[in-house]
Amino acid sequence: MEKLVLIDGHSILNRAFYGVPNLTNSEGLHTNAVYGFLNILFKVLDEEKADYLAVAFDLKTPTFRHKMFDAYKGTRKPMPEELHEQVPLMKEVLTAMGVPILTKEGYEADDILGTIAKREQKEGYEVTILSGDRDLLQLSDTHIRICLPKTSRGTTEVHNYYPEDVIREYQVTPEQFIEVKALMGDQSDNIPGVPSIGEKTATNLIVQYQNLENIYAHLDEVKPPRAKKALEEYKDLADLSLKLARICIDAPIEFSMADAKLENLYTPEAYEYMKRLEFKSIAARFGEEIKHESGPEKQFVLVEDFSEADALFEKAKKADRIGMELLAENGSVTALALCFEETGSYIFPVGGFMTESYIAGKYEELCRTGHAWVLDLKHSLPFADLSYGDTVYDAGVAAYLLNPLKDSYGYDDIARDLLGMTVPSRADLIKKLSCEDAYAKEPENFTRMAGLMAYTAFAAGKPLLERLTADGMEELYRTIELPLIYTLFHMEAEGIAVRREELAAYGEKLKRQIAVLEKEIWEMTGQEFNINSPKQLGEILFEKIQIKGGKKTKTGYSTAADVLEKLAPNYPVIQKILDYRQYTKLNSTYADGLGTYIREDGRIHSRFNQTITATGRISSTEPNLQNIPIRMELGREIRKVFVPRDGFIFLDADYSQIELRVLAHMSGDERLIEAYKTAQDIHAITASQVFHIPLDEVTPLQRRNAKAVNFGIVYGISAFGLSEDLSISRKEAMDYIARYFETYPQVKTFLDSLVAHAKEQGYVTTMFGRRRPVPELKSSNFMQRSFGERVAMNSPIQGTAADIIKIAMIRVDERLRRENLRSRLILQVHDELLVETAEDEKEIVMKILSEEMHHAASLKVELEIDMHDGKNWFEAK
């Protein structure tokens, strides 16, 4: 039998909206419901191997049910705006995929689905109805299956119902299912039902009497008496409810199976939507169909003749703007892509007289023209001798500044966002092949990819600069982000040395401690078990030894860190478990993990990323050296394995309380500024003023609490969050925060102004003009809006601190090189810089660090730096 899939459009879209976390694309469009809908659709189609597909939607106009009962669906809350804006978008996507959209004035989508399903079943089709509404179970039949999907965090499970499945779960047939609903009513649709009859009584009555008509025929026998009385009194409501709940299966719907025939969902038009909405995983389904592009046709010319290449390079030098990409990986250059005119790009592969050094040299020359745009400058620097004096425009970094919320800034992203073009990505064209392999095995696709890269860099350069200027970020781009590329490359190239033998010894020490903790936990619980198994751990803690306060989930007890941390003060075994987890993580992440990153030179060369975080902070990967533990003694000891070269030491310089100092400056709060100007203990002063006690009487606990408030305020902490951090009541936390704002009133005014500005403008800015969009403030969800308010308060402060450390990094690195010193900046961890310092250069490096870090920004309070040295990172910190 051929298969027809029918979808309840609004129902599935609504379910997807609440099942998938909030998503927006670079245009600011909410996309989570559409994304979830498509995932559900493709999951069902993959499993069904359907031949026909159609989607039914409700209209806003009244239906025949409203004529029967004015209050029908009258209790429903309005659709959230974030979902409402996705309904027309969903219809556009389906239309682009060639899927028929069905609506009918005066009828609901359920009626359309019921009519078509029953009709086509009679014609010999196998029908699947996809809906989030259990009311459709009444349509279940021999050849009609009802699929109810459940989506959680983007993962979908589908529950299937034929008549026997309905009977098994609800004890009634599909026909009787609606009789039950007529008795019990339906609050979501405002179907009244019979007052005082709930689901259990309704089910029992229908099981016993089969239907509503038969119940009334035997009303004298009905028990309990309360139900009998209600049925007598509210017969009209029962009859009305049955009519409202029953799906119409003979609606006047014009529908042709030929229109619903599944030919090709993966159309070029649909692919453009997937790219626009930034659904990369869904776009990947389009396979060969997506190897097209929208926009003017471009020519991508492969140039293998040396003389022709030389002439083109000379011509490019005279152009007003150049777009380039050096295709180089794994230490070797494959080709150079170049564009200097709208018609297309030239690709120069390595070969013959065009050696790697020749190609890299030409790239370097063109970069020095001062008007070259590339996609990823840092990636090319191992092959080109460029540095701070060379102005090369990086399109990826520019695109990041314009929208730091995206997860990628590839040429296909930039083409879509800046040029309005849909082009295939690298993965679309050469899959996972390296550039060298792609040129050898897929030369046509490689040439096309390279040409698109160069053209995108060329064409996007002008609009990128114009938008940066319009948004007030051109100076930030030129003076901080572009020079930073060189700084980060220098740090990556230098790396940091790791002693393998000490790393191995550290691992053994951890393993011994883990074994001790494991034995202690077993002894305290009276049983050997797998401590790493949440299921076993939950059963031991909350059932066997009966610890109070456990949270039961569908899969067992929650043993998440936040649950255990609340219980740890009262249960020593839980503190042991938390320690055990810390040590096992240290062992896997660092003792075992770091060794895989040590190269032949004995050093780890981590990657530093400047286009990852929304606030502007630099991140570190492969491995993440910014996440080295500092709270546990054994965690801090991992820093001992990081060592300088012979004849060198480490100098570590750390900004002291930089975010609080930025807060004092940006808020202009006189008391906070004065506290820093007098170089007093800011946390003790806050405790003294908040708790109204003399400074010399502040206790260590009060200072700790004041410190939590000080730093919490920077992150927009709520009373609930502070109460959790300090293990105090929410009322006490509210009092702390209120007193803090009484003490520093301009801080409150400043933070409120940030939120107000973000609500009005949609973004906040740092002291240096960096923008951070805050789309969460537009959400109809309270939790999302609250998160948005915290982001609005914190981002200008954290982002300004990030800008300051970037300025310091650039100046320190550039000055070390300018003064021909052997010492090198090798690591940045949030507010901390680590310099591998020649022993005979210690004094001058300390002077450079002090001067450049102090003068990185001019604040109303002085920037303070703590500096230490040592023979390893542990000693220097």
PLM features per residue range, with description:
Residues 153-181, 300, 334-469, 480, ...:
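Active-site-proximal helix-loop-helix substrate-binding element of RNase H-like nuclease domains
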Residues 6-7, 129-131, 323-325, 392-393, ...:
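Short hydrophobic beta-strand that contains or immediately precedes a catalytic carboxylate
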Residues 394, 484-493, 499, 655, ...:
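Catalytic palm active-site di-aspartate
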Residues 230, 234-353, 371-372, 433-630, ...:
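Conserved "right-hand" nucleotidyltransferase catalytic core of DNA-directed polymerases
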